Design a protein with these regions (language model features):
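Binuclear metal-dependent phosphoesterase catalytic core
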Residues: 2, 91-95, 132-134, 138-171
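Core catalytic region of metal-dependent phosphoesterases/phosphodiesterases
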Residues: 2-94
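Hydrophobic/aromatic beta-strand patches that form the interior of the parallel beta-sheet core
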Residues: 4, 32, 67-69, 119-121, ...
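Thr-Gly-centered strand-to-loop micro-motif
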Residues: 6, 102, 140-141
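Active-site environment of divalent metal-dependent phosphoester hydrolases
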Residues: 10-17, 39-41, 72-79, 106-111, ...
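A broadly tuned preference for mixed-charge, low-complexity surface segments
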Residues: 51-66, 122-128, 141-158, 167
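Internal catalytic-core helix/loop-beta-alpha segment
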Residues: 82-129
Length: 171
């Protein structure tokens, strides 16, 4: 199982259009989005080519391969235009590893959920990283459209062997 993990699109159709291309290029099996799909939020600037409905159409076209975790900028009304479900979190077992997916505003490496896991993926902070802490792996794909702290537009690929943080150029 190969996963494409992205977060924090914030309504940018420019970067959302890259998702199907990255999915195909990486030969991923599924896409997991860690929230903040359509709205840019009051603290963020408008992202490039801001068009929440275009982002929705792109994501709806990928619905068969898509799992989505709700972010702090995602509203209940967003679910009415989306052909996929928004989950509060996901807990999947892949390759005998329990993997917890969340947005990051509630649970992250500093505030752990009650559920036991081996790997936690979360977004929210717009800063990509992969780190180990107390025998657990924490990974953040950064933001596809609005990276912060001098980081790049990025995503994560997870396969049976490793977790890799990549910028949108694929490096």
């Amino acid at each position: 199982m190969k996963l494409l993990i992205i977060s924090d699109i914030h309504g940018s159709s420019y970067y959302a259009k890259m998702i199907p291309e990255i999915f195909k290029l990486e030969k991923a099996d599924e896409i997991i989005i860690l929230g903040d799909l359509y709205y840019h939020g009051p603290r963020n600037p408008l992202p490039k080519d801001y068009s929440p409905m275009d982002v929705c159409n792109i994501l709806n076209s990928l619905k068969e391969k898509l799992k989505v975790v709700r972010g702090n900028c995602d509203a209940l009304v967003d679910e009415t235009i989306s052909d996929f479900n928004f989950h509060d979190h996901l807990l999947l077992t892949i390759n005998n590893k329990r993997i917890y997916f969340t947005h990051g505003d509630k649970y992250n490496q500093d505030v752990l959920p009650d559920e036991k896991f081996d790997i936690m993926f979360y977004g929210h902070f717009h800063t990509g990283f992969i780190r180990k802490k107390n025998n657990l792996i924490f990974a953040n794909p950064g933001s596809l459209s609005l990276p912060k702290n001098n980081t790049r537009h990025s995503y994560i690929i997870m396969d049976s062997e490793k977790i890799t943080l990549k910028d949108i150029s694929g490096s």
